[in-house]
């Protein structure tokens, strides 16, 4: 690129109508001049060629992505990980904020991702390592999306559960049980105090546990538990499947008693979820398979916060995400980034309920609550309820007992002295 070419991909905020731009934060490592590398990054994701041969024209003022901010630090030791790079020159670690005109692709998630996470970004000259750290949308862009139908307030209203976390449970054994014993486990967990008993993300519509039969039995169990406890309950059915079956499975599950639906967001596709949102009559709940493949590495891929924002944009009312436990291998600051992405203002898009999960139990509830900093979250044990030594009802009860202690300002171990279900949970799971 010539100096004039490079200059065409830089702008000041004051010179742009920011309502027309999505802002993107990237971290990248480059070989050669960082200013040229950042210009290439803008060019490749927008106007890779900005004029026709023989024409006096320039498409960059309207169509080019533009650098708003750039910082660069030399890396004398080279790239942070061994990587192929055809470019030569000093290596720099860079942080850039780019304004990308959303008129290039419109309010369409597949086209958005094709631009800001596509070939142009991950094959930009001189940049072998790059991570999209954040994405911010202007209000006119957000206005084209419906977002969550129910959001946090709607989910709480359905459960009549206010001023406390929402208590989920993953029915386990998660794979292998036929519908009848599976439903019995759900029933026990509801009577013990769960708000929502759910299918595992890997249990879908299979011949040995068909969704219609499973939903009918769990729907009946859910209604019985609600009547017996006097508290609303929800069965969360997994309808993850091929896109052309989503509306059919929605109708089957809801007609048979499911009060919410689980969809594995990235395997199914966010555009499919947006389509389903227009049809859905119950809350939609996201699970996180496939996301770590994008987000795990600190210097390459896509920050999971971006995925969280996109799931909210597509219409999920609840987003289950990797939580604070060591098994989840997610830095605490990244979990908190994702929680904020669910809760913070996003134009007309309703907040969605964050559910940080992974190997949780009554023994971890207080830690999760303190880290989140409010009661606006979901708590989703699996074995912490269904592997409780006294059974699923006691496992669910132990969760509620732990919350009662936290809400009353009583140390959880002290409360356990007079609550055997909680005491058993702390003994069984306290070392995790």
Swiss-Prot record:
One of its GO terms (biological process) is carbon fixation. Mg(2+) binds at residues 198, 200-201. Binds 1 Mg(2+) ion per subunit. Its cofactor is Mg(2+). Homodimer. PANTHER family: RIBULOSE BISPHOSPHATE CARBOXYLASE, RIBULOSE BISPHOSPHATE CARBOXYLASE LARGE CHAIN. This is Ribulose bisphosphate carboxylase-like protein 2.
């Amino acid at each position: 690129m010539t100096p004039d070419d490079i200059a065409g991909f830089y702008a000041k905020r004051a010179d742009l109508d920011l309502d027309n731009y999505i802002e993107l934060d990237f971290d990248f490592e480059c070989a050669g001049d960082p200013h040229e590398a950042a210009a290439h990054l803008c060019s490749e994701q927008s106007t890779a060629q900005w004029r026709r041969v023989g024409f006096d024209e320039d498409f960059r003022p309207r169509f080019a992505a533009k650098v708003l901010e750039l910082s660069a630090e030399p890396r004398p030791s080279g790239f942070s990980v061994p990587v192929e790079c055809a470019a030569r020159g000093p290596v720099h670690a860079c942080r850039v904020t780019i304004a990308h005109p959303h008129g290039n692709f419109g309010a369409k998630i597949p086209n958005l991702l094709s631009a800001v996470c596509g070939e142009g970004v991950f094959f930009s000259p001189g940049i072998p390592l790059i991570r999209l750290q954040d994405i911010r949308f202007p209000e006119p862009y957000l206005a084209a999306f419906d977002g969550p139908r129910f959001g946090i307030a709607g989910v709480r209203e359905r459960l009549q559960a206010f001023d406390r976390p929402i208590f989920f449970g993953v029915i386990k054994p998660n794979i292998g049980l036929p519908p009848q014993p599976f439903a019995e486990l759900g029933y026990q967990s509801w009577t013990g105090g769960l708000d929502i008993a759910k299918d595992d993300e890997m249990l879908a519509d299979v011949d040995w546990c068909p969704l219609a039969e499973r939903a009918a039995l769990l729907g009946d169990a859910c209604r019985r538990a609600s009547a017996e406890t006097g508290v609303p309950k929800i069965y969360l059915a997994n309808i993850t499947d091929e896109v052309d079956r989503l509306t059919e499975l929605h109708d089957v599950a809801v007609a048979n008693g499911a009060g919410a639906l689980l969809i594995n967001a990235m395997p199914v596709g966010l555009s499919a979820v947006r389509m389903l949102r227009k049809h859905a009559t119950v809350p939609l709940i996201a699970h996180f398979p496939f996301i770590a493949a994008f987000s795990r590495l600190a210097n390459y891929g896509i920050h999971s916060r971006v995925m969280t924002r996109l799931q909210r944009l597509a219409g999920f009312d609840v987003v289950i995400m990797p939580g604070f436990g060591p098994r989840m291998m997610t830095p605490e600051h990244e979990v908190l980034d994702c929680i904020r992405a669910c809760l913070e203002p996003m134009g007309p898009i309703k907040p969605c309920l964050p559910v940080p999960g992974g190997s949780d139990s009554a023994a971890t509830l207080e830690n999760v609550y303190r880290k989140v900093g409010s009661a606006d979250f979901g708590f989703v044990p699996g074995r912490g309820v269904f592997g409780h030594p006294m059974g699923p009802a006691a496992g669910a009860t132990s969760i509620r007992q732990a919350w009662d202690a936290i809400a009353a300002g009583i140390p959880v171990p002290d409360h356990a002295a007079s609550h055997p279900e909680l005491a058993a949970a702390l003994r069984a799971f306290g070392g995790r």
